[in-house]
Amino acid sequence: MPTATPLDVSELIGCLGHGEISAVDVVREQIEHLRDVHEATNCVAAWNAAAESQAAALDARFAAGGPIGPLHGVPITVKDWIDVAGMPCTGGDIAHRDRVPTRDATVVARLHAAGAIVIAKTTVQVDSELWGSVRNPIDPTRSPGASSSGEAAAVGGGGSFLGIGSDSGGSLRVPAAWCGVATLKPSAGRVPITGHFPRVGERVDGRTQIGPLAASVGTLARVLGIIAGPDGVDAGVAPVPLADPAAVAVAGLRVGWFLGDDSFPTTPAIRNAINHAVQQLESLGALAGGAIDPRLDEALDITLRYWKRSSGRLEGWDVEAHLMDWDRYRSRMLRAHAGVDIVVMPVTLATAPLHRDMETSDYIFTMPASLTGAPAVVVPVGFDAQLPIAVQVVAHHWRDDIALRAAAAIEAAS
């Protein structure tokens, strides 16, 4: 099995931008790395046969002195729920195995315009009728997480510099935590989901957000600046300016925390990691804001009814009651978070379990930010028995910049 070491994109961008290495060479080498990771994890759903020719076109433009984008020549992978023109997009469903979109999803088009090159689509779900089981790059006997598991395995195994996945209830955050990579679930309404399959109104609604997975929080911030903003199609995306995380001062930030509760207890290693992260922020001048209760039992009840509604098993007055309870939960969380800027909390109850189907409790700590639409960053902070540990940094809606800056500070101290 290849060494499971996520690759940071910053140095690569510098080398490509200065002509020290060609995009073709980078793409060829990265495809070989990804093949090794795929052999170990089963993370690839489809390969892009045009990747080298796309890289050659970028090299020709660079040689001619033409403009290059901020991700010039960077090889990336994309979850097989997100359209890439000319490549299969099945959503992991055997009924759609022959579906090949003719246009890119908005986020993919923006990444292409920035110079990125899609080298592969990645598998979804832990187990799939189309592809079989996805394995964790750290330990193949362990689960890689939820539906963005192929992306997390590709990035966590060092097969991809940057992954693009999606998250409705934790599908970016749980795989990232278990595979040892950073990720961002952006604020609801920040990034268009045009070109996400299944479509809005089928099995996807306003909880679903597209976001990046990478080796570092800095790369997440770089990519968010590229993919965010209205596209004239997704009516759920608002023209809210994206503030620069680098402009956020950690000193003075009010930090809340949650360690778990009696109903959903976390392991000692995870509780210690959260306490350490909070202490690191306080050492930089952040202010202790106290413990925050995310009302997990309430979040679980609303989420379970959401799943029933999305599958047509909730009708009539029950649907209206569910939506009213969801609104009340959002209001309660606004009041609970009023005295803090961020909350540092667990991503999961424990480190990656032995390979199994996902359980509802695996998502318990990711449910609150999914229901409120708040931005949430997952940042790896260490290991317990050689398995990755991560913490989740949740900020107020639209304050992706604060979540990213605080997570970067935690990352730097880890």
Give a label for each model feature:
Residues 19, 30, 73, 79, ...:
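Glycine-rich, small-residue loops and helix-cap segments
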